[in-house]
Amino acid sequence: MTSWRDKSAKVQVKESELPSSIPAQTGLTFNIWYNKWSQGFAGNTRFVSPFALQPQLHSGKTRGDNDGQLFFCLFFAKGMCCLGPKCEYLHHIPDEEDIGKLALRTEVLDCFGREKFADYREDMGGIGSFRKKNKTLYVGGIDGALNSKHLKPAQIESRIRFVFSRLGDIDRIRYVESKNCGFVKFKYQANAEFAKEAMSNQTLLLPSDKEWDDRREGTGLLVKWANEDPDPAAQKRLQEELKLESLNMMVHLINNNTNSAGTEVNNKNNERLDRTFPEASVDNVKKRLLPLDNGMESDDFIEKLKKVKKNISRENISSKPSVGKLGGPLLDYLSSDED
């Protein structure tokens, strides 16, 4: 399979095909500050977007990759970027390397570079909060996204897994039949932020469905942030997961820095040795020219981090509840499709 690094990003849509920034008239007066019509019937704003991201087809290198950009293109996530390789933002799915760079840069901006807020919105929509990490998405509006197509619960969960798994590593997915909603937990928050924008107002129909041509008549998925699980055991597991994620990130960054720094030092030392001792054996000289170990880049330090990570993993496994005992937000979430 070809990596996105081996190709240029695709132009997802022509500029002439982009919708107007002014919404359809639903009132008497247009407010230029809020980009909304007032003094009229608001109507149903739910719809199925005519644009959709296809990660394998659309991903590729952009001008942002060459400029060292950290943030991703919001319009790429929505499937409607008209710049392609000329875009100043990234056009691929966030991976571990991107997540490590974002974590070092800031915690108050999302993966698109937008400022987060102190608290979540009342309806759990929007950009999110910088106070708490949230990797779980609530997925509603499933009936409208299927154009009322009747499917078994296992089939619905399978479709949710298919469309969301393309947008990052999934921790777990659960479909709650009684409330006709689903929950998708990603391994990293940046992937959850990306998927929330990419899957909002998208259909769950597939090209093989006979209803595919009429998909625009549906209302699309409603994707929001999931509420925090009030269960103390679940909160403890969450803290352990965050601690383990931080340790994983530290090991990943230290390994990368050690490898890159070691390569650079060796190259410089070899150049110096070639100029100074072109013919003599220089094994002893190489040892004297190597930098002193500061303790942070040694194998012992990395091994200690890995041991701590293993201990946390064992505690996490031993504290997990049995399969038959389910609870938390997967069953107690009060939102519905009509939110």
From Swiss-Prot:
It is found in: Nucleus. The keyword Cell cycle applies. Keywords: Cell cycle, Metal-binding, mRNA processing, mRNA splicing, Nucleus, Phosphoprotein, RNA-binding, Spliceosome, Zinc, Zinc-finger. It comes from the Eukaryota. A zinc finger (C3H1-type) spans 67-94. One of its GO terms (molecular function) is pre-mRNA binding. The modification Phosphoserine is found at S335, S336. One of its GO terms (biological process) is positive regulation of RNA splicing. SUPFAM superfamilies: RNA-binding domain, RBD. Gene3D superfamilies: 3.30.70.330. The C-terminal RRM domain and the zinc finger motif are necessary for RNA-binding. Belongs to the CWC complex (or CEF1-associated complex), a spliceosome subcomplex composed of the U2, U5 and U6 snRNAs and at least BUD13, BUD31, BRR2, CDC40, CEF1, CLF1, CUS1, CWC2, CWC15, CWC21, CWC22, CWC23, CWC24, CWC25, CWC27, ECM2, HSH155, IST3, ISY1, LEA1, MSL1, NTC20, PRP8, PRP9, PRP11, PRP19, PRP21, PRP22, PRP45, PRP46, SLU7, SMB1, SMD1, SMD2, SMD3, SMX2, SMX3, SNT309, SNU114, SPP2, SYF1, SYF2, RSE1 and YJU2. Interacts with ISY1. Interacts with PRP19. Belongs to the RRM CWC2 family. This is Pre-mRNA-splicing factor CWC2. It comes from Saccharomyces cerevisiae (strain ATCC 204508 / S288c). The gene is CWC2.
